[in-house]
Amino acid sequence: MLMPKKVKHRKVQRGRMKGKATRGNSIAYGDYAIQATECAWITNNQIESARIAINRYIRRGGKLWIKIFPDKPVTEKPAETRMGSGKGSPEYWVAVVKPGRILFELSGVPEETAREAMRLASHKLPIKTKFVTKRDFEEVGGESDEG
């Protein structure tokens, strides 16, 4: 499972998810990727399920990069416990994902294979996603340089 080896603070506040992703919103390594279109917490189990779905579909070919990491602990109190008496214990880890964030990148496979693999992975995730290619970002980058 994905989780940090060591953390400065064992418990953190929930925080707010507002705005768009300012970092990690372009393809860095692969040719194809899935991009988040809404915000959510994605757990380490969901990331692992999506990774397995992609790897099973592409089999031996291609290389996969996971661009998100669950570094936020989520605490839960035991069932049937009265309110108060402190914050619960950390139960699982989540990655905070904002719209525009690249979740997975893939290369070394045909576009149709990548599209289907990413579709299978997106069914394992709790958010809406869209399939993007490196060409999409090059076109956008080319237009902004000229204008």
Swiss-Prot record:
The entry's keywords: Ribonucleoprotein, Ribosomal protein, RNA-binding, rRNA-binding, tRNA-binding
Database matches in InterPro entries: Ribosomal_uL16, Ribosomal_uL16_bact-type, Ribosomal_uL16_CS, Ribosomal_uL16_dom, Ribosomal_uL16_sf
GO molecular function ontology, one term from the record: rRNA binding
CDD domains associated with the record: Ribosomal_L16_L10e
One of the GO biological process terms: translation
GO cellular component, one term: cytosolic large ribosomal subunit
Renumbered residue ranges of the record's region Disordered: 1-20
SUPFAM superfamilies: Ribosomal protein L16p/L10e
Top-level taxon: Bacteria
Quaternary structure and partners: Part of the 50S ribosomal subunit.
Family statement: Belongs to the universal ribosomal protein uL16 family.
Main function: Binds 23S rRNA and is also seen to make contacts with the A and possibly P site tRNAs.
Name by which UniProt lists this protein: Large ribosomal subunit protein uL16
Gene source species: Clostridium kluyveri (strain ATCC 8527 / DSM 555 / NBRC 12016 / NCIMB 10680 / K1)
